[in-house]
Amino acid sequence: MSAEIICVGTELLLGDILNGNAQYLAQQLAQLGIPHYHQTVVGDNPDRIKQVIEIAISRANILIFTGGLGPTPDDLTCETIADFFGSPLVESPEIIEDITQKFAQRGRVMTPSNRKQALIPQGADILPNPTGTAPGIIWEPRPDMTIFTFPGVPSEMHRMWQETAVPFLKNQGWGQEIIYSRSLKFWGIGESALAEKVTAYLNLPNPTVAPYAGKGEVRLRVSAKAPSEVAAEALIAPVEKQIKDIAGLDFYGVNHDSLASVVGELLRSSGETLSVAESCTGGLLGQMLTEISGSSDYFWGGVISYDNSVKAGLLGVNPEDLDKLGAVSDTVAEQMAIGVKTRLSTTWALSITGIAGPNGGTETKPVGLVYIGLAGPGDEVTSFKYNFGTMRDRSFIRHLSACTALDLLRRRLLTR
């Protein structure tokens, strides 16, 4: 017994609209413990919709459709489903009355095209839409097969799912077990290297462990099936602890943790402060830090020293070093960190200087070369050299630079 999500809409295929409905429904199915192995996006074409249904019924017992329930000619979901299963469409007086009242409440008269939304397969139950004019259906066209249809408007679909579909599914016995997941996050290690370290855990039956790469980071999704979230967490906890022990400092957080939030909590707990000096990241590091509510407890501010005159004038970088070594060098990175730490009187300081591209690289200093400075209590200062590669774009290099700077400080705070 499993479910399949089928999202109908050419606008989804063209990328005009982000398919948030599939994400929402996938999360909801997990909360009900309903297995879910496939999602499909298909355009507003009856033949292709039928092809998708043909495949879906061979591997799933619950089909959940979103989109294609409107009044226009290209809204074909309901009639195509009915045609596939050989069922006639019947007009629902209840739906006609509901649509008529909604138009009247808005001071309008229902258009003839809206009558199309009242056509449902014979024998289907209405899935009421409290806010819009597009109702859905719950239909069992054959034994051991249930079909749900929802409008594509997310707010309407969410409410209809919660108020009608969830009670129906729970009445069918679903929801007695849930699928609960925790996302373990890692920085400073590649996906393949991490997978090799935790290979013994990748074939566990319950909880399951699966690696996937994010934007510069790696995640392990640990999922358990259990009667409750508490029971699932009890299954996950020992596996999570063992993986953390194996990964060491490469592990940095779970679920919605970010490097900025983790660093922030470490600084807050120690009563210490941070400032930043940025060149190639242009304020991105400061933005990451200030996205965290309450970051003013530990983040004093920063200097965007894009031009060398600012590096020298505001941060006290030696002009001779700038001329001789260039702005992208370990010496300049260290002086930037010392300068902003001194100027803002903070415990710690981070600096970033590099070549984000796509222009500006040379044979000796290619695009992707970045130096990160870290200044700490007393006279502590050091720098780190990274080459993030010439094949990555400007945005990604800046992102890697800012996150790596946060990770360096995180590791320093944890190992002092």
Swiss-Prot record:
Transmembrane segments: none
Coiled-coil positions: none
Source superkingdom: Bacteria
Gene3D superfamilies linked: 3.30.70.2860, CinA-like, MoaB/Mog-like domain
InterPro entries reported for this sequence: CinA (IPR050101), CinA-like_C (IPR036653), CinA_C (IPR008136), CinA_KH (IPR041424), Competence-induced_CinA (IPR008135), MoaB/Mog-like_dom_sf (IPR036425), MoaB/Mog_dom (IPR001453)
Cross-referenced Pfam families: CinA (PF02464), CinA_KH (PF18146), MoCF_biosynth (PF00994)
Disulphide bridges, residue numbers: none
Homology family: Belongs to the CinA family.
Name of the protein in its database record: CinA-like protein
Lineage summary: Bacteria, Bacillati, Cyanobacteriota, Cyanophyceae, Nostocales
